[in-house]
A protein has these predicted regions:
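Outer-membrane beta-barrel biogenesis signature
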Residues: 14-62, 186-191, 195-219, 232, ...
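Compositionally biased regions
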Residues: 7-8, 17, 284, 326
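Outer membrane beta-barrel
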Residues: 26-43, 62-196, 247-251, 327-332, ...
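Signature for the C-terminal beta-barrel architecture of outer-membrane proteins
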Residues: 108-120, 156-326
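Outer-membrane beta-barrel pore domains
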Residues: 28, 45-47, 60, 105-108, ...
Length: 415
């Protein structure tokens, strides 16, 4: 881990350690909540060797797995009238570190006596992109498998910095919020999209996490300074990134949110095997509460990522990426919910390095039924099927077009 990366993470951890004593006189105790997630998984694929470029984390043909998928613990405490703190530790199946910090945040939310509201947060947290992953420890109340967009957010996007929001609230509860953030430690965002493509799962990277690259020998034959693993929250150039957007909401009716993100990474910088990836995108989401206890959620993302110096008219790697998802969920009776989601996503190669194919066109369906008992116990039955065309599969002599199915039975206990 390089010095810039470790300095940023050290600041976040130090913040969480020293803050409670500083506010000790006003500290009102700690609340703890979390979850444990147990999973049975079966995968089916056209090719049993289709693992590196599978659309699922547990790729391959005819695999049966039972494991503890995830465990999370969140501690929250009020640090005064306007300040609260929160830190989440996670265990994740296949994680680089068995237990690590997922989020560590200080919230500032002063009481307002006018329609104008100001709040802020400082630390390590997710940018306000997802409208689905709103439950405990960034899980979804609708499905086990996240959408392609939210899967990538969980893998490679996390804010290490500060965010401020200014909102105007009407008496009926309607409000508009404008937000912006500055951050570091996100210079490698885009690595997985370009080298591997999109993937659908429910894994959220922790702050010291890392991912093995697909077909690493081939990647290193072209980019000799690239590490065998990518660190999703590395700082390589010392330049801050930013995002900005707005949110429109009528509570319990409709919510619209959009933002523009730019990590401002220098694509020509390499440090400790980690390249800077200049990644920019626009994200938009709409959530509508419909009659008959129906919920509709649409999310879209369109962006570009670049790495390396110019080769011809483009950066060494220059990839456009896009994704859309549409989820419809219905609460049948108390404690019972069914959800269906369609995802379509892909990447387009702009660069001129023919030895590095990285184009993709894919789509997927997810159907989920969950049953919640006594608030704390939830059973999920889910199937996700994906049809994908990924040109990078040809590097492993695999047909670029693959059909995969993921069956899951999940038991979650919340506390």
């Amino acid at each position: 881990m390089n010095n810039k990366t470790s300095s940023g993470i050290f600041f976040i951890v130090l913040l969480c350690i020293i803050t409670p004593p500083l506010f000790a006189e006003n500290f009102h105790g700690i609340q703890a909540h979390g979850l444990a997630d147990f999973r049975y998984i079966r995968t089916d694929s056209d090719n049993q060797n289709n693992t590196d470029f599978s659309k699922f984390s547990e790729g391959g043909a005819n695999r049966d797995l039972f494991h503890v998928n995830e465990a999370a613990l969140t501690l929250q405490g009020r640090l005064g009238w306007s300040w609260t703190g929160s830190i989440t530790a996670k265990y994740g199946h296949n994680a680089k570190n068995p237990v690590d910090i997922s989020e560590a945040v200080l919230f500032f939310k002063p009481v307002s006596t006018s329609p104008w509201r100001v709040n802020a947060r400082l630390g390590s947290f997710y940018a306000p992109i997802s409208l689905e992953n709103t439950s405990t420890a960034w899980t979804s109340p609708y499905t086990l498998t996240s959408s392609a967009i939210n899967s990538w957010v969980g893998e490679e996007l996390k804010t290490f910095g500060g965010e401020a929001t200014v909102g105007y609230h009407l008496e009926n509860g309607d409000h508009v919020d404008f937000f912006g953030a500055g951050f570091g430690n996100n210079d490698t965002a885009g690595t997985l999209l370009a080298f591997r493509g999109w993937r659908m799962h429910d894994y959220e990277a922790t702050i010291l996490d890392g991912f093995k690259l697909p077909n690493p020998a081939h990647i290193q034959s072209i980019f000799t300074r690239q590490s065998l693993t990518t660190q999703p929250f590395a700082e390589v150039d010392g330049r801050a990134g930013y995002y900005a957007g707005f949110n429109l909401e009528r509570p319990d009716a409709v919510k619209f949110r959009t933002l523009y993100y730019d990590n401002r990474a220098n694509p020509t910088v390499v440090e400790n095997g980690q390249y800077g990836w200049h990644t920019r995108f626009v994200s938009a989401g709409l959530k509508v509460i419909l009659p008959f206890q129906l919920t509709l959620i649409e999310q879209s993302m369109l962006g570009n990522t670049q790495m390396g110096g110019l080769v011809g008219n483009h950066a060494a790697i220059d990839v456009n990426f896009w994704a859309h998802s549409l989820l419809l969920s219905k609460k049948i009776i108390e404690g019972h919910r069914i959800s269906v989601r369609y995802d379509i996503f892909g990447t387009h190669k702009n660069d001129e390095i023919v030895q590095n194919p990285n184009a993709e066109n894919s789509h997927a369906w997810t159907a989920n039924y969950n049953w919640t008992l006594f608030t704390h116990h939830q059973f999920n039955f889910e199937v996700t099927t994906s049809t994908s065309d990924v040109t990078a599969r040809t590097l492993q002599t695999i047909n670029p077009s693959q059909h995969e199915t993921l069956w899951q039975i999940g038991y979650r206990v919340f506390f």
